[in-house]
Amino acid sequence: MKNLIAFFLMLFIVQQGFTQNQPQNLLSGKYSPEELKQILIPQSQWIPFPKITDREGWAKADKQRMEILLKNAEGYLDYDFPYIPATKSLLIVRTGDRNEYQAISFKKRNVLGTLLLAEIYENKGRFVDKIVDGVWSVCEESWWGVPAHLPKTPENAGLIDVSKPFVDLFAAETATFLSWVDYFMGEKFDQVSPQLRKRIYYETNRRIFEPLMNQYHGWMGYKTDGSRPNNWNPWICSNWLKGTSKNHIFPFSFSMILI
């Protein structure tokens, strides 16, 4: 056992030395913005999954799994998307509990995702209004992150300062989630109200893209103290890229994000 531990410790040390000597700007160091624009396909041509109008594509989905999902979605037709009380967020400083807040937040997103997939599969319109309610409810949340990730400062004291949005794991994930909703439901949303997609873009830009472009986040690393990026970095950045690639009115180009 001691030999095994020593082996992995040595492997870790060697790996650290190897990675420290490798260039960190593999993408930006290889391609210029102009070259990226030539390499990347136009956003309109990027179709990672069949659109809701591609019935032939969705006919290939696993029927048994989709029927189960459809039944689950039917059980949510009477679900009311709740707001999250401030006192649920305050629990993080009052009792240390993070689960009550997260249970409400995660449930809302799980329900919305189930309704979304059911509507995509069935395409009869009966889940649209409930999806609209879900999107609007998420957009009206004060923060898309979780209280456990709030700064431990008297200024916050268990609540988000909505004038100073910052990006944690779940905020970034929510931005990508809403961009997928828009990707699949955009045309149906336009038939309901143009304000739906406009709200998604507004909230995503305000809460996610603008803070990421204009302010330093500790998980980014390498500012003045020599800190390294932490494990939040790849998750948030991957959601950042996915979100921008599907948000067609985001003010910064996708190639600009990549560099």
State the predicted function of each range.
Residues 107-121, 133-137, 172-183:
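Non-membrane alpha-helical segments in proteins
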Residues 158-259:
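Active-site lining segments of carbohydrate-active enzymes
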Residues 1-23:
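Bacterial Sec-dependent N-terminal signal peptides
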Residues 72-75, 97-118, 243:
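Short, 15-30-residue, compositionally biased linear elements
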Residues 86-101, 151-164, 220-228:
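Internal amphipathic alpha-helical repeat/solenoid segments
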